[in-house]
Amino acid sequence: MTTPLAEVLDGQHAAELRKAARALLKQPLLLARGRYAEEFRLARRHASELREWFDRNTGWALQADTEAARLRKSPGVLTDPTHPARDTTRGAAPFTRRRYVLLCLALAALERGEAQIALGRLADQIVLDAADPRLAATGIEFALERRDERLDLAAVVRLLLDLGVLRRVAGEEEAYVSGAGDVLYDVERRVLAGLLASRRGPSTVHAEAFDDRLAELVAETAMDSDELRFRAMRRSLTRRLLDDPVLYYDDLSDAELGYLTRQRGFLTARITELTGLVAEVRAEGIAMVDPEDDLTDLRMPEQGTYGHVTLLLAEHLAAADGPVDLDELALRVRELASQHGGFWSKSAREPGMETELVAQAVARLAALGLVSRTPYAVVVRPALARYAVGETVIREPGSAPVPPQRKATS
């Protein structure tokens, strides 16, 4: 029996819409050229429908023109430090505070600059701006004379290249780092203009404390009616369901938990319809799981030495009945090295490496919502139970642990 043309077209439309939505969630800045060109075309084709969905359900604005599609995402939890920018060319090292400051100074310099700029010229402008007494008072200084400072700037430039803000015309960053040459870039001004994802310009924020400034940047309109308060909760919860590996009930306020209890089916169904993510509801919380295992920047388990160590420590932590000291985990890694070291890299077996291995593992587990950290210990969260060795104890019907997946975001 032949399928009616209308059904075929509806199915094609739904598939394109889902692919575009997933692409925007994974890469919120899509360019007309490059590896996401196909996804950009779909996002632009369905921009009106996507714009309405994201605005209603998350409060994220979508802008699309002939050069780029930009989903202005903001995180559901502003204080989450587990998703830093990374220098993918150097072991995925997370950005430090210094690199973030350099990034902001570089963006400011590019905004004022011409259509082309050399890396050396960009560095000179950053040094001048960094001399501002207000910045110096924070303890951040840049002379860009030392190799480590130039490496930091090169990492920032590589991020801007990856985002499409810059296009390399000639030269290599390594030549600049070593002092043997310079690099020339085209500045994509429309892409640059779309990077800022705040609801208001930072220059209009007058609060002094960091937390207050951050809150002002993303603040919505005054919640002076039940309708507006419910809308704010719907948007906040949907953002967290889309971005966070697990939404734990005990992280919510009483009002948020009450709203989620009443609207859970509606919220999760809307997300599933658009993205294909599937809700797994358990006693402790909800995880929107991706059957395609694509909408995530962190996986568990992962390949390689660090992935193996992380999995082994997850099994160890799942059996804990309270906080576990970091020193205890380091001791456990030394024990594991004697059993499994033959499968690890040579550097991981060197004396003293257990501290770094623990730090890497705990960072990944925290980013996946499996543990939380204190300065000297690790606290297990319910979803880690899926990595326990042996039978999982079910506390009540439906309380099996939820599988974690950290959604990609930027």
Task: Give the residues covered by each predicted segment.
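Positively charged, polyanion-binding regions of nucleic-acid-associated proteins
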Residues: 25, 96-118, 305-324
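Basic, short loop/linker segments at the boundary and entry of helix-turn-helix/winged-helix-like folds
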Residues: 76-102, 294-306
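A short, conserved structural fragment
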Residues: 58-62, 155-157, 161-172, 276-280, ...
